[in-house]
Amino acid sequence: MKRIHLHLLSDSTGETLEMIAKAALAQFENADVVRHFWPMVRSRQHLERIVPELSNNPGLVLFTLVNAETRRALRDHCRRLSLPAVDALDEVTAALEVQLGQEAHGRPGRQHKMDEAYFKRVEAIQFTIAHDDGVGWENWEEADIVLAGVSRSSKTPTSIYLANRGYKVANIPLVMESPPPPALYELKNPMVVGLTTAPERLVQIRRNRLLTLNEQAETSYVEKDRVTEEVKFARRLFSDNNWPVIDVTRRSIEETAAAVIRLHNERHARVKPGEKPI
C-alpha cells in the first residue's frame, strides 16, 4: 500500500481544513496517509519554518490561507519543491465574490469570531448537556428539538452534535414500563423527533455496551424478542403522536443530525412570521 504525506496549513484553528480532508479521505478505503498539521500560520516567517518539513516529507499540501502574501509564498515554495498545492476555499471564495459583488475580507479566523452565533452555540451545548437522558423535562419547552427513542438509539451523541450546530436539544429514553412525562405530549415550540433502529442492530450495540462495562451479557436488555417489542412500542408512540421518525440503523451520527436539521428547517419553513410552530 502506498503511503502519502498530507500537509494541512491553516491561518486559523484548522478545523475547517481538517473537516475537508476527513471528508475527502473517507472516499478512499485503507488509505495510508501521514498527516502533518500546521495551524495558525499567519506570517511569512512562520511559513518559512514549515518549508523544511514540506521538503523532508513531500506530499500533497492542502491549505486555507486568506493572506495573499502568505498564500503566494506557499505556492512559490510548492512549485520549487514540485509539490501539489490545493487552496481548499479558493474556488468557493472566488465564486462568492462574483455573486455578491464584493471582495473577501482576507482576514484569518473570521468564522471563529465571538459573535452572537458563538454564544448561541455555547448556550445550546450547556442546555443540551443539562437535558440529557430525560432530565429537566420542566424546561423542554425551551428546546428547539426533543429526541425520543429506546436505549442506545444514538440520542445523546446526536443531541451533542446538534448542540454544536447551535440547536438546544433535549432527549428522552423510551421504556415500556415507564411512560414518558405528560410534558412530552404538550410541547408547542420544540420539534419532537423519534429515533428508531433495527432490533438486530440494537441488540448488537447493547451487547457491545455491556461488554465495555464488564456486565452480564445475557439479560432482557439484549434479548431479541424483548428488544423487538421495545422498538415496536416506540414506533407506535411516534405514530400515535404524528412525530417524524428517523431510522438510524445505517446512519452515522452526522447523517442522523443532518436529517433532523432538514426536518426542523422544513417545519419552520411552513410557519408564517409571528406564528408558533404547530
From Swiss-Prot:
Organism of derivation: Erythrobacter litoralis (strain HTCC2594)
NCBIfam families, alphabetized = PRK05339.1
| Function statement | Bifunctional serine/threonine kinase and phosphorylase involved in the regulation of the pyruvate, phosphate dikinase (PPDK) by catalyzing its phosphorylation/dephosphorylation.
Name of the featured protein:
Putative pyruvate, phosphate dikinase regulatory protein
**Which of UniProt's keywords are assigned here?**
Kinase, Nucleotide-binding, Serine/threonine-protein kinase, Transferase
Keyword Kinase attached? yes
InterPro entries found in the cross-reference section: Kinase-pyrophosphorylase, PPDK_reg
The superkingdom listed in its UniProt entry is Bacteria
